[in-house]
A protein has these predicted regions:
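N-terminal amphipathic/basic leader segments beginning at the initiator methionine
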Residues: 1-33
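Mg2+-dependent prenyl diphosphate-binding active-site environment of isoprenoid biosynthetic enzymes
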Residues: 31-268, 330
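Short, charged, low-complexity loops and linkers
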Residues: 5-13, 106-108, 164-170, 285-293
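Short, structured helix-loop boundary elements
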Residues: 16, 20, 75, 141, ...
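Mobile late-domain/C-terminal helix-loop "cap" segments
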Residues: 266, 270-314
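Short acidic alpha-helix initiation/capping motifs at coil-to-helix transition points
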Residues: 20-22, 120-122, 250-251, 301-306
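Short, amphipathic C-terminal "tail helix"
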Residues: 6, 306, 313-337
Length: 337
């Protein structure tokens, strides 16, 4: 369940809509879209989309639209597409990282191998764009294709930065923006675009563009906070909460903000070669050293600042929409508290 979903549902329900019904429709349509693609490939695609998750991105599509009642087919298509893209990136990430667990379950690459996992991710990407294209408008496809291009660049940046002790704070956030925040931005832009189509006479074109940009900025800011908090959670664990071993980022050479800042505070960490870590126990011991520096508290403060910045970027919106989006932003932090 997405952060703050219960409170968000109550706010939106007061405006005459049922968030849970919309999200059920998203789930059902995703399941239909990945069915019928062969026994093996279809099985892994279905398992991927049914594995759960926060469904935060489709929720943002719905809330950014400002359409409280009777969401359009265009809006549902956008919500489905953005979540399928997210699922596809997770499958491909696991291939590149060699991850064996996600959400406490074996990954596709662990259970079926690299070729099958790559094909599963490709299928999810294809179904996402087919779903958008079937709506007949070019703008949603443009928004999502731009985001997928950025996702690919972010993944390559992460590979380039692997094991690199000199990754800067700026480069870390550039990578987070590409790998994570752009899809949050796309979710909000897709929602805004669908909402404007639903209300074609609602304001001048310039105002509609500013609204889309402001909502996109909101999404990008909470996406950055989301990724930073996720990186903190990799250090703090525990595995039963994260669904993966504590310190998994350290073991695959991914340098995140907690480690970058801890190296500034502890000279012994500055000389640590991540390639020397071989076991989960060794990674957990380094996590304890990172936590002892106070770097996690600093990182949390930065994430909280990003959430406050996100809320400050929201334009003047209907009360239900403003409240619901602010609750989602707060929920990103609350999930990690």
């Amino acid at each position: 369940m997405a952060p703050g979903t219960a409170s968000v549902h109550a706010v939106v329900a007061a405006a005459g809509a049922d968030t849970s019904a919309v999200m059920r429709e998203v789930e059902e349509r995703m399941a239909r879209l990945v069915s019928g693609h062969g026994h093996v490939l279809g099985h892994h695609a279905r398992s991927t989309v049914s594995a759960g998750g926060k469904r935060l991105r489709p929720l943002l599509v719905f809330l950014a639209s400002g359409v409280p009642v009777c969401p359009t087919d265009r809006l549902i298509r956008a919500a489905v597409a953005v979540e399928l893209i997210h699922a596809a990136t997770l499958v491909h990430d696991d291939v590149l990282d060699g991850s064996s667990l996600r959400r406490g379950r074996p990954t596709v690459v662990a259970s079926g191998g690299r070729l099958l996992a790559t094909a599963t991710g490709d299928l999810l990407f294809a179904r996402a764009f087919a779903e958008l294209a079937a709506g007949g408008a070019a703008e949603p496809v443009r928004i999502l294709s731009r985001s997928v291009s950025a996702l690919a660049a972010g993944e390559l940046m992460q590979r380039d930065d692997a094991w690199n002790a000199s990754v800067s704070v700026k480069r870390y956030f550039d990578r987070c923006r590409l790998k994570t925040a752009v899809l949050f931005r796309a979710a909000c832009e897709l929602g805004a675009e669908a909402g404007q189509r639903h209300r074609p006479g609602d304001g001048a074109a310039g105002r509609r563009t500013r609204l889309s940009d402001s909502l996109g900025n909101f999404g990008e800011s909470i996406g950055l906070a989301f990724q930073l908090l996720d990186d903190i959670l990799d250090v703090t664990g525990p595995p039963e909460r994260t669904g993966k071993p504590r310190g998994a980022d350290l073991l695959d050479g991914t340098v995140t903000l907690p480690l970058i800042e801890a190296r500034e505070l502890d000279p012994s960490l500055a000389t640590l070669d991540l390639r020397s870590l071989r076991t989960a126990e060794e990674a957990a011991a380094v996590c304890d050293r990172i936590a002892a520096t106070g770097a996690l508290e600093s990182a949390r403060e930065q994430a909280l600042g990003m959430v406050l910045e996100a809320k400050a970027t929201l334009p003047e919106l209907p009360e239900f929409q403003q409240s619901a989006l602010e609750l989602v932003a707060d929920g990103v932090v609350e999930r990690y508290s």
